[in-house]
């Protein structure tokens, strides 16, 4: 029992057993209990038992509690245990066993390993069956595998083998490899090797590297964090890891595959694409690609070489196409040229140099071979055959007519030879017949030669074009052509002809302007016309028709027939072209570089010319229709076709065309008709008188017609003399002074003419005769050559002037012949006339000075001005027949001058003087004189010598209406009578400058010899309708015109400054009121003075001021008293002219024979040399324009005194509100002080300035004279419209039949200066070329509303309705884009600004007025003389700017405003609308000046920062400028000045808050 129990004695009951056995219990229940306990323990699991064992005591306690046991039993059990544990070995062993079991149970419960279960952490495999070593090995393997699986995650995509850049995707790696290879210049082969090595290394070294790497990674990943990340990477990378090598291989294979196909096509294109891409990526890459082509694109040297060869070939081919003679083809040459061509072709084949030599035309080879080579590329083999044939035909054509018929016969064979290539025999025959038909239709086949020629020409045009190059192919060449070759060529041509305009397989369409569509084929265009195919490729667009997309190009400006013919030539070298299509074909050929066709087209006209030689000659004689029209007009004027033939000279015709436009020609035609009637009437009135002068005039003027006209004019002159004896007396006084001394001595005929002119001066009183006489004057300018022809100077006698005027009239009729003679005379200026002029000027006789004045305006600075003013004045009349409409272009219209140089040469001669007077009609040749440039020798003999002074000034003749001319003639005669007018030429160089600027055309000078001019100017302001009388009446307008012309110097005399339409005779007095006021020479009879309107008064003032200025500039050579007739004359003359003369006269002769003039001189004061200048103005002939013309002239030009002193006169003249000529700043600058005021107003201004200025005031600053001029300008602007002007003149006439006293005139001028003459500025602006390029105005009207809002926002303007925004933007643009200089800064283009300018001018005028007011005080020089010439020019420019403003608003309105301002100061008149406008302008100007005077405020305005309106108003009030809030806002708006009323609104709101209830308001009240 014991041994058994021992092994099984793991249970506690064993001790009991042992105890039992050892100490048997006496009772049975006790044994049974033990057995049961064992059984229970055996049945229970160890853990339970263990737990129970631990709980044994409690259980036992519980059992003991539950099952009451006997105390003896319990005690026995306890004792047994105690005995076993302590005393017995068995108990000890049991305790140990129990303890061990407890530990085992606890360990087994803690970990699986202790329980004998082992699992792999990596793969979860059960390792319980393995020992510790094997388990470790297994775990290591799993770790390695895990590392291997995770390792590809880091190097998933290989780095770049070149730069080592890592990649996230294979695509990025592939693209980078190519780009990097290009950048690093790694060849494709080397790149492939690097990639392969990169992929091979992991394969070869994968085992060693991977383990090591894996070990590292494993070691890292054994950490908790790494192990967690690894599985994630494995999941992502597992699929990619196995394909890594595959991906690399694919990348490499792709690059290789791309290179192969890409290299050939991409070589040209991909290179650019790569470059572009590289450039887009990095800027540095842009530089390298051009140096080295992309490496990956270029595969090998062979491919690269081929590509280079292709490029070079392409370039060479392009050059060949562009070259006029394509490279010769050796094989073709040999074929075409049998023997000679063969060896010649061989040479080119062997050496390229031979071909070049052939192309160089060295002459080593026959022309035929050269043609063959050159024509083949464009024309293929056909060309050579055609060329030989053409040469054959050409010789035939060149042969005489008898041979030509054979040529026609041979032309068929010849045509066959060329057509051998192009057409079949039947086709050739048809073409030949067609050519004959065309020629017959054209009337070319009338003669056998043309007919014969026509056939070959049509057939051989193409070949003939080749000979045109200078090579004539031998006939043998055509003979060489075989019939078979010709047949094949004909078939080829036929086949190609079938393709012309054939939609079948057409890949190009040409759409014409008519909408017709022509079909063509690119390959034909490519082969025949590279430029056309290029045009198609660049300019074509896709059009879809019937579902097919085709290229379509637009052929504009081409007729359908011409386009068809062009395609026929391209397709089959068809040379049959109707002559009517030749121009269009030639234009197409030139457009698309078909040189052969161009040559053919040139040949066709040649044939036509041969057939019709007469028409060609006729066209040569008359180059243009305009010429023919001019000839017809001349024939009408001359009344004889023979004279027309003389006028048909090409030189004259060319000049005429240059100077005369169609509108002007029409006006001239009308004027000619009127003048004829007047001339006829004059002849009937006084045939005897006219006959005598005619003889003289005929002697003077070469053409007989001129003589006849001069006779007629003499008759008219006599009639005028009878009507104006007073004027004649004045002329006589001039003669006494020495007018005719040199002139008469040198030209007795002219002296006689001068007498005739005197008679004319008398007759000038008769308005009708005056008009005729004016016309005569106008005609005179037409005959400067004739005048020159008579080398004798013009007599100083008024008769001579009248004769000259009559001659001028005759010349008008004989304008053609006269022009021819004039050109001749201009070429050879008469020394006698020149000497005469100089002598007269030296002598200082009135007549001489007159003559000098004419010449002086062109020759000497001062004298030239006065003369030029006179001449220009006179020339305007002369021009009137030719250019009544556009006096500005009067010189151009009457462009009879031959050569400007010749004119200049004549300027030194008396003829030049006459031209300066403006008697000569043709100003075209004379160079325009720069008004600003004044010869500084006022008293020098040359300056005195009108010829010298003239300096080739273009003579402009103003065309006047019959009434105006008559009036002007009277005035001219009066002015001629006064010696003062004559003295005018001696005036300061300035006046000469002004007039020189006004350059009257040399032809005028030529037409009227200096004597004639002087006589006409001196005596013939009456007699000078043709001469100075007409000029006197029109002088101011003419001067204005001439000044403008001078402004337009470069363009020759300008007739744009024509005076507004001449009023009726009643209005104009003896002379035009303007002329009377302006021209001092012209007597200012009481009637004339009365007739003179306020504008003439202004003109006189202007002339006086100008004269004073001139006197300052030029010491008065001769004191001249202003005669009444002289003053009248000045009135008639443009202010510029009258100024110089009147000024000189006044300075030289304080007293003038004429009572009116004396009064004038007294008022103007002796120092006023301007009065003498005024006589100079008399010389100017005014041309009556239509109302429109008058209006334009009034706005544009003011009377400019050609002889006036440059500065002051310029002021007055250029302040020409009345003068029609627009004055530009440039013109003003050239003119210097010249002003373009209306003739009458300028005269008045000159007179006033003279009154204000002492005789020494000739140089008085323009400021003083400026004011006067501005006054006159104001009047002129008031009379901006012809009606206003004439009304003004009529008012003047009504005011004083006699010339108003100088004091009155000065006062008037002074008033007028008070108001700046904005219209004058406006006029100037019209013709003013912008100093800075004019920025084109954006098209605001088509802009979207958001864009408009943005534009307005730029200028700080709030959004407005679209229409208002457009208007506002346009206004802003006008203000911000000025074309004038700083002087015109204030002159914003808006009409309001012009009003402001008048204010500024008014201030300037005011400064001048004080000096003017003391008419007789020489202290005036302090006012006007204080300003230097530069200041005068500045003042002139200011006036011009003011005039420019007048253009913005009606010149009449501004003129009225100016008059009102003047009257407001000098005469109190009820406030009128014009006065209100002037006041508004003054206010606006004051506001502008105030803003400019405040730098901070000005800066704020310039920055478009809003100005507080209320504050500005308050400041203005404080400074004495009260302005209503509404008016101020309008002014600021007009100036584009942003302002705000926020402060005022806030104040109002505050005020309202303070007074919330109506009761409070009432209480306060």
From Swiss-Prot:
Basic and acidic residues composition bias: residue spans: 43-58, 715-730, 809-822, 967-985
GO CC, any one term: chromatin
Low complexity compositional bias, start-end: 833-848, 861-875, 1437-1449
Interaction with PLK1 and TERF2-TERF2IP as annotated region, ranges: 499-1565
Zn finger intervals (UBZ4-type): 117-147, 157-185
Binding site for Zn(2+) 1: 120, 123, 138, 142
Domain BTB residues, every copy: 506-579
Biological processes annotated in GO: DNA double-strand break processing involved in repair via single-strand annealing; DNA replication; double-strand break repair via homologous recombination; negative regulation of telomere maintenance via telomere lengthening; nucleotide-excision repair; positive regulation of t-circle formation; positive regulation of telomere maintenance; response to intra-S DNA damage checkpoint signaling
Stretches the record annotates as Interaction with SLX1: 1406-1565
Record cross-link Glycyl lysine isopeptide (Lys-Gly) (interchain with G-Cter in SUMO2), residues: 115, 171, 283, 649, 886, 898, 925, 983, 1349-1350
Keyword Acetylation set for record: no
Keyword Cytoplasm: no
Residue numbers spanned by region Disordered: 1-87, 203-242, 279-305, 387-418, 683-769, 789-848, 861-943, 963-989, 1063-1099, 1128-1212, 1249-1337, 1381-1449, 1546-1565
Effect recorded for residue 1324 to W: Does not modify the functional properties of the protein
GO molecular function terms listed in the Swiss-Prot or TrEMBL record: DNA binding; enzyme activator activity; zinc ion binding
Tissue specificity annotation: Highly expressed in testis. Expressed in bone marrow, brain, thymus and weakly in heart, kidney and spleen.
Sequence positions that bind Zn(2+) 2: 160, 163, 176, 180
Main location: nucleus
Protein keywords: DNA damage, DNA recombination, DNA repair, Isopeptide bond, Metal-binding, Nucleus, Phosphoprotein, Repeat, Ubl conjugation, Zinc, Zinc-finger
Chain's role: Regulatory subunit that interacts with and increases the activity of different structure-specific endonucleases. Has several distinct roles in protecting genome stability by resolving diverse forms of deleterious DNA structures originating from replication and recombination intermediates and from DNA damage. Component of the SLX1-SLX4 structure-specific endonuclease that resolves DNA secondary structures generated during DNA repair and recombination. Has endonuclease activity towards branched DNA substrates, introducing single-strand cuts in duplex DNA close to junctions with ss-DNA.
Subunit structure: Forms a heterodimer with SLX1A/GIYD1. Interacts with ERCC4/XPF; catalytic subunit of the ERCC4-ERCC1 endonuclease. Interacts with MUS81; catalytic subunit of the MUS81-EME1 endonuclease. Interacts with MSH2; component of the MSH2-MSH3 mismatch repair complex. Interacts with TERF2-TERF2IP. Interacts with PLK1 and SLX4IP.
Family to which the UniProt record says this protein belongs: Belongs to the SLX4 family.
UniProt-recorded name of the protein: Structure-specific endonuclease subunit SLX4
Organism this protein belongs to: Mus musculus (Mouse)
Gene behind the chain: Slx4
């Amino acid at each position: 029992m014991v041994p058994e129990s021992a092994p099984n004695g793991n249970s506690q009951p064993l001790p009991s057993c042992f105890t039992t056995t050892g100490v048997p219990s006496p009772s049975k229940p006790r044994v049974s209990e033990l057995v049961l306990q064992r059984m229970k323990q055996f049945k229970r699991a160890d853990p339970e038992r263990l737990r129970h064992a631990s709980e044994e005591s409690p259980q036992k306690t519980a059992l003991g509690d539950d099952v009451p046991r006997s105390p003896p039993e319990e005690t026995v059990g306890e004792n047994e245990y105690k005995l076993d544990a302590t005393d017995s070995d068995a108990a000890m062993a049991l305790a140990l066993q129990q303890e061990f079991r407890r530990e085992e149970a606890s360990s087994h419960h803690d970990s699986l390993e202790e329980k004998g279960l082992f699992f792999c952490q990596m793969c979860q495999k059960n390792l319980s069956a393995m020992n510790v070593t094997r388990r470790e090995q297994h775990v290591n393997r799993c770790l390695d595998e895990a590392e291997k699986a995770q390792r590809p995650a880091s190097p998933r995509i290989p780095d770049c083998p070149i730069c080592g850049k890592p990649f996230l995707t294979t695509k990025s790696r592939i693209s980078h490899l190519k780009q990097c290879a290009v950048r690093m210049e790694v060849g494709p082969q080397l790149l492939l090797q690097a990639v392969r090595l990169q992929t091979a290394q992991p394969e070869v070294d994968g085992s060693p590297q991977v383990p090591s790497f894996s070990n590292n990674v494993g070691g890292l990943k054994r950490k908790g964090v790494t192990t967690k990340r690894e599985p994630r990477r494995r999941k992502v990378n597992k699929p990619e890891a196995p394909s890594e090598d595959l991906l690399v291989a694919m990348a490499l294979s792709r690059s290789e595959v791309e290179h192969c196909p890409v290299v050939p096509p991409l070589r040209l294109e991909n290179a650019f694409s790569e470059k572009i891409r590289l450039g887009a990526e990095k800027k540095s890459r842009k530089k390298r690609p051009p140096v080295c082509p992309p490496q990956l694109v270029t595969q090998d040297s062979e491919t690269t070489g081929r590509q280079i060869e292709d490029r070079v070939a392409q370039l060479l081919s392009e050059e060949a196409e562009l070259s006029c003679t394509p490279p010769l083809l050796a094989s073709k040459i040999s074929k075409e040229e049998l023997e000679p061509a063969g060896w010649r072709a061989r040479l080119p084949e062997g050496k390229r140099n031979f071909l070049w030599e052939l192309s160089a035309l060295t002459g080593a080879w026959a022309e035929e071979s050269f043609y063959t080579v050159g024509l083949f590329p464009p024309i293929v083999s056909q060309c050579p055959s055609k060329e030989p044939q053409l040469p054959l035909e050409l010789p035939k054509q060149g042969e005489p007519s008898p041979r030509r018929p054979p040529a026609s016969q041979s032309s068929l064979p010849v045509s066959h030879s060329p057509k051998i290539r192009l057409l079949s025999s039947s086709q050739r025959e048809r073409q030949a017949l067609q050519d004959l038909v065309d020629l017959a239709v054209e009337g070319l086949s009338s003669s056998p030669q043309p007919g014969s020629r026509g056939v070959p020409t049509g057939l051989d045009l193409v070949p003939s074009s080749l000979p045109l190059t200078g090579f004539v192919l031998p006939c043998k060449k055509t003979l060489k052509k075989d019939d078979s070759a010709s047949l094949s060529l004909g078939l080829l041509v036929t086949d190609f002809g079938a393709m012309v305009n054939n939609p079948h397989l057409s890949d190009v369409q040409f759409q014409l302007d008519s909408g017709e569509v022509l079909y063509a084929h690119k390959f034909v265009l490519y082969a025949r016309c590279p430029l056309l195919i290029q045009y198609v490729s660049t300019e074509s667009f896709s059009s879809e028709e019937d579902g097919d997309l085709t290229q379509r190009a637009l052929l504009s400006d081409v007729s359908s027939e011409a386009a068809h013919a062009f395609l026929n030539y391209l397709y089959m070298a068809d040379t049959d072209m109707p002559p009517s299509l030749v121009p269009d074909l030639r234009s197409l050929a030139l457009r698309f570089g078909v040189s052969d066709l161009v040559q053919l087209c040139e040949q066709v006209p040649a044939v036509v010319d041969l057939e019709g030689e007469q028409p060609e000659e006729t066209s040569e004689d008359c180059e243009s229709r305009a010429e023919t029209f001019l000839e017809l007009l001349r024939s009408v004027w001359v009344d004889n076709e023979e004279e027309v033939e003389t006028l048909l000279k090409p030189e004259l015709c060319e000049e005429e065309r240059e100077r005369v436009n169609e509108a002007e020609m029409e006006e001239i035609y009308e004027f000619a008709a009127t003048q004829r009637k007047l001339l006829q009437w004059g002849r009937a009135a006084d045939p005897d008188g006219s006959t005598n002068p005619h003889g003289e005039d005929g002697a003077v003027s070469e053409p007989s017609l001129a003589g006849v006209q001069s006779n007629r004019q003499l008759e008219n002159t006599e009639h005028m003399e009878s009507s104006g004896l007073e004027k004649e007396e004045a002329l006589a006084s001039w003669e006494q002074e020495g007018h005719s001394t040199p002139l008469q001595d040198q030209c007795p005929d002219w002296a006689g003419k001068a007498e005739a002119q005197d008679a004319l001066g008398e007759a000038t009183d008769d308005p009708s005769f005056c008009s005729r006489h004016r016309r005569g004057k106008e005609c005179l300018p037409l005959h400067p050559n004739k005048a020159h022809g008579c080398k004798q100077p013009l007599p100083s006698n008024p008769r001579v002037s009248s004769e000259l005027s009559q001659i001028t009239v005759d010349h008008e009729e004989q304008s053609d012949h006269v022009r021819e003679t004039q050109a001749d005379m201009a070429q050879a200026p008469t020394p006698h006339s020149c000497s005469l002029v100089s002598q007269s000027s030296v002598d200082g006789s009135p007549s001489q000075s007159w003559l000098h004045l004419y010449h002086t305006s062109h020759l000497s600075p001062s004298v030239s001005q006065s003369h030029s003013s006179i001449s220009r004045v006179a020339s305007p009349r002369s021009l009137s027949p030719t250019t009544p409409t556009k006096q500005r272009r009067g010189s151009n219209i009457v462009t009879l001058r031959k050569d400007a140089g010749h004119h200049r040469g004549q300027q030194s001669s008396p003829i030049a003087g006459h031209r300066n007077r403006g008697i000569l009609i043709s100003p075209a040749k004379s160079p325009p004189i720069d008004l600003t440039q004044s010869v500084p020798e006022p008293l020098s003999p040359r300056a005195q010598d009108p010829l010298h002074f003239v300096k080739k000034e273009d003579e402009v003749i103003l065309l006047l209406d019959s009434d105006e001319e008559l009036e002007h003639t009277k005035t001219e005669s009066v002015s001629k009578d006064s010696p003062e007018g004559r003295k005018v030429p001696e005036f300061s160089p300035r006046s000469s400058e002004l007039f020189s600027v006004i350059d009257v055309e040399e032809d005028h000078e030529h037409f009227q010899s200096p004597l004639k001019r002087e006589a006409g100017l001196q005596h013939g302001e009456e007699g000078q309708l043709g001469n100075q009388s007409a000029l006197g009446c029109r002088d101011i307008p003419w001067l204005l015109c001439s000044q403008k012309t001078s402004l337009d110097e470069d363009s020759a005399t300008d007739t744009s400054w024509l005076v507004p339409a001449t009023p009726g005779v009643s209005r104009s007095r003896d002379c035009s009121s303007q002329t009377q006021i302006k021209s001092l020479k012209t007597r200012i009879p009481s009637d004339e003075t009365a007739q003179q309107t306020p504008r003439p008064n202004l003109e006189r003032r202007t002339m006086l001021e100008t004269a004073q200025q001139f006197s300052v500039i030029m010491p008065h050579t001769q004191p001249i008293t202003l005669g009444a007739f002289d003053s009248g004359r000045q009135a008639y003359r443009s202010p510029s002219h009258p100024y110089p003369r009147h000024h000189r006269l006044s300075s030289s002769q304080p007293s003038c024979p004429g009572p009116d003039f004396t009064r004038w001189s007294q008022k103007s004061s002796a120092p006023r040399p301007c009065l003498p200048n005024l006589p100079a103005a008399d010389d100017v002939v005014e041309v009556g324009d239509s109302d429109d013309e008058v209006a334009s002239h009034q706005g544009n030009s003011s009377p400019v005194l050609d002889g006036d002193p440059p500065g002051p006169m310029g002021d007055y003249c250029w302040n020409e509100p009345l003068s029609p000529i627009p004055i530009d700043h440039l013109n003003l600058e050239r003119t210097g002080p010249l002003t373009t005021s209306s003739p009458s107003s300028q005269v008045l201004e000159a007179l006033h300035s003279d009154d204000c200025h002492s005789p020494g005031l000739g140089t008085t600053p323009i400021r003083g004279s400026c004011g006067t001029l501005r006054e006159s300008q104001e009047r002129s602007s008031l009379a901006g419209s012809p009606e206003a002007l004439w009304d003004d003149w009529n008012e003047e006439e009504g005011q004083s039949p006699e010339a108003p006293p100088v004091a009155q005139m000065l006062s008037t001028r002074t008033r007028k200066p008070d108001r700046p003459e904005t219209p004058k500025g406006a006029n100037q602006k019209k013709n003013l070329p912008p100093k800075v390029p004019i920025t084109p105005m954006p098209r605001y009207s088509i802009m979207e509303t958001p864009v408009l809002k943005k534009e307005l926002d730029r200028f700080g303007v709030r959004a407005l309705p679209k229409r208002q925004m457009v208007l506002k933007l346009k206004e802003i643009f006008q203000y911000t884009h000025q074309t004038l200089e700083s002087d015109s800064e204030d002159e914003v283009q808006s009409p309001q600004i012009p009003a402001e300018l008048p204010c500024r001018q008014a201030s300037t005028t005011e400064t001048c007025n004080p000096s003017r007011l003391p008419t007789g005080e020489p202290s005036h020089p302090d006012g006007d003389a204080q300003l230097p010439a530069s200041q005068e020019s500045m003042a002139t420019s200011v006036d011009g700017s003011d005039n420019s403003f007048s253009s913005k608003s009606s010149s009449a309105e501004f003129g009225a405003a100016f008059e009102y301002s003047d009257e407001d100061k000098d005469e109190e008149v009820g406030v009128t609308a014009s006065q209100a406008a002037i006041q508004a302008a003054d206010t606006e100007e004051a506001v502008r000046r105030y803003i400019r005077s405040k730098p901070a405020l000005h800066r704020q305005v310039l920055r478009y920062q809003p100005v507080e309106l209320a504050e500005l108003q308050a400041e203005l009030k404080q400074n004495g400028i009260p302005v209503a809030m509404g008016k101020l806002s309008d002014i600021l708006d007009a100036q584009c000045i942003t302002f705000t009323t926020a402060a005022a609104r806030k104040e109002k709101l505050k005020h309202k808050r303070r007074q919330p209830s109506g009761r409070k308001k009432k209480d306060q009240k």
